[in-house]
Amino acid sequence: MVTALYRRYRPETFAEMIGQSQVTEPLMTALRTDRVNHAYLFSGPRGCGKTTSARILARCLNCAEGPTDTPCGVCPSCVELSRGGSGSLDVVEIDAASHNGVDDARDLRERAVFAPARDRYKIFILDEAHMVTSQGFNALLKLVEEPPDHVKFIFATTEPDKVLGTIRSRTHHYPFRLVPPAPMLEYVQKLCDEEGVQVEPGVLSLVVRAGGGSPRDTLSLLDQLIAGSESSTVGYERAVALLGYTHGALLDEVVDAIGAGDASGAFAAADRVVQTGQDPRRFVEDLLERLRDLIVVAATSPEAAAAVLRGIPSDELARMGAQAAAFGSAELSRVADLVSQTLTEMTGATSPRLHLELMLARVLVPSADDSERGALARVERLERRIGVTDAAGPAAEPETGRAPAPAVAAAESRAQAAESRPQA
């Protein structure tokens, strides 16, 4: 039986935590200066390190060399609270989701009176603290306000607003946050290197995106991909199928067809989405993500685009550069708006395929869009056909909800006249 990745690589010190410097640095400072409070409230999304940080804080407080911001890792307390340790008698973890009543609070209050069995402090970690009832919190109120010198409380919750206000006011509140993509990508790459696992280009970007900034969710998905791989290499095809994302080749096909005005190719790709059992909503969401990337590529230099779009292979970035050039800024903006509007319309829709195909029809026919944005897209398309370039740079974004400006209409008329003139 193999232990899950998120358990094997659970941090044991604050220095090993990623993306939570707003929490770890103040806590380490408090430990170094001996200004530790009697009660803490850790809040934030699931899987971002709240319970892990509570255990690390308990190790720091009860370390034989402590209180210290860096536990020694060899004393009995550190060993018992380490990754895979048996647990300490003086560190009590309570699942508040199932121990949330008055009787449980009274039992905790009675246990807090007794001195620690061996260590410096008796520490109570209440996970899912928002599940404690008002009566349970009220039973704990006096103890949390004025605990014995040997007692520390750490509350962990995903919903701090549901924790009784009088309890919150007696704690030091540290909000955790989701980990940004860049450090998460670096972390999972390092983990794969330590595990001796090879991943094909683009796989880790999908894993980080699917994890949504939660280290635990990200490692669970990576663990699933590694377990389902026949060799020590995680393939892109299997990752796309398992995570439910649209294959990059299919997105390239649709984008190329839209850029070239190829209705047959675009509708054939949409049909393949349905025939292969993919979710049309997921396809539209992935298409919007790709259009966002193309807008970044079109608006910035290759170096800046590579810095923003981390994890995308260089050959794919080059291909996206060619796709962005085939559209133009105004056309990309218009298409992205239509795709975003369709994604909103598909929420709760009974026929998502119909919305997908209608979206493609609107995207492929700019003349159906009578807004100023649509007029600019038509002008840009005509200028590209006759080889006219914009020497003054990209125009300012027009205000929506107004009739096309006279300058836009005049420019469109000139472009149409130039297109109709016979070529020399």
Description of each model-found segment:
Residues 11, 50, 59, 113, ...:
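General helical structural elements
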Residues 1-173:
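P-loop/Walker A NTP-binding region and its immediately flanking N-terminal helices
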Residues 32, 64-67, 301, 385, ...:
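Serine/threonine-rich low-complexity intrinsically disordered regions
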Residues 67, 243, 247, 406-409, ...:
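Residue-level marker of regulatory loop/turn positions in helix-turn-helix DNA-binding domains and
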Residues 76-89, 100, 104-110, 117-120, ...:
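Extended, largely alpha-helical regulatory/partner-binding modules appended to the mid-to-C-terminal parts
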Residues 13, 95, 235, 279, ...:
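Short, solvent-exposed coil/turn linker segments
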Residues 390-424:
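Long, low-complexity intrinsically disordered regions
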